[in-house]
Amino acid sequence: MLPEEIIKRPIITEKSMSMIPQKKYTFEVDRRANKIEIKKAVEQLFGVEVEKVWTMNVKPKRKRVGRFEGRTKAWKKAIVKLTDRSKTIEFFDSLI
């Protein structure tokens, strides 16, 4: 898989933004990607050094519209910690 296919989008929440000073960044990633692929993709796309990767599968939630019931899609979340000597990811710096 290409790095652009692995990293889908950044997760911008209050909790994820509070982890940026510790050099932890949160992304939605492809469900088939493993930690090694995620690490390589972040290093290639952003030019940083990754120390550790945590992943979690987010289960779908039930949603109703009137009498019809459906589900949101299941997705995979990755939290990436950069090394101390690594530079920060510029995209997130503009959000703080």
From Swiss-Prot:
Keywords: Ribonucleoprotein, Ribosomal protein, RNA-binding, rRNA-binding. It comes from the Bacteria. InterPro entries: Nucleotide-bd_a/b_plait_sf, Ribosomal_uL23-like, Ribosomal_uL23/eL15/eS24_sf, Ribosomal_uL23_CS. GO terms for cellular component: ribonucleoprotein complex; ribosome. Pfam families: Ribosomal_L23. GO terms for biological process: translation. GO terms for molecular function: rRNA binding; structural constituent of ribosome. One of the early assembly proteins it binds 23S rRNA. One of the proteins that surrounds the polypeptide exit tunnel on the outside of the ribosome. Forms the main docking site for trigger factor binding to the ribosome. Part of the 50S ribosomal subunit. Contacts protein L29, and trigger factor when it is bound to the ribosome. Belongs to the universal ribosomal protein uL23 family. This is Large ribosomal subunit protein uL23. It comes from Caldicellulosiruptor bescii (strain ATCC BAA-1888 / DSM 6725 / KCTC 15123 / Z-1320) (Anaerocellum thermophilum).
